[in-house]
């Protein structure tokens, strides 16, 4: 099974059509990767589906970079 970081970057690649080598952990979805608000909602939904978790609106607002999404998923997986 791929690790969390690879899986998240694959989702970003698929949703935002950005080359994977351009997706850095400190990249902001909006400022660096060009996502708009609809894109970020779709990213959150894709994360929920991929990792079989629920992300509240409050949590989703805090997930605004690649690294924050990795950290969040790692914490959620530890609680399972």
From Swiss-Prot:
Gene giving rise to this polypeptide: acpP
Modified residues (O-(pantetheine 4'-phosphoryl)serine): 37
Record keywords, A-Z: Cytoplasm, Fatty acid biosynthesis, Fatty acid metabolism, Lipid biosynthesis, Lipid metabolism, Phosphopantetheine, Phosphoprotein
SUPFAM superfamilies documented for this protein: ACP-like
Coiled coil: none
PROSITE patterns for this protein: CARRIER, PHOSPHOPANTETHEINE
Pfam families associated with the record: PP-binding (PF00550)
Cited HAMAP family: Acyl_carrier
Transmembrane stretches, start-end: none
Gene3D superfamilies given in the database record: ACP-like (1.10.1200.10)
Entry similarity comment: Belongs to the acyl carrier protein (ACP) family.
Domain of life of the native organism: Bacteria
Organism field: Buchnera aphidicola subsp. Acyrthosiphon pisum (strain APS) (Acyrthosiphon pisum symbiotic bacterium)
GO molecular function term, any single one: acyl carrier activity
Post-translational modification, as annotated: 4'-phosphopantetheine is transferred from CoA to a specific serine of apo-ACP by AcpS. This modification is essential for activity because fatty acids are bound in thioester linkage to the sulfhydryl of the prosthetic group.
GO biological process: lipid A biosynthetic process
Functional summary from the UniProt entry: Carrier of the growing fatty acid chain in fatty acid biosynthesis.
Main location: cytoplasm
Pathway in which the depicted protein is active: Lipid metabolism; fatty acid biosynthesis
Protein name: Acyl carrier protein
All copies of domain Carrier, residue ranges: 2-77
Compartment annotation: Cytoplasm
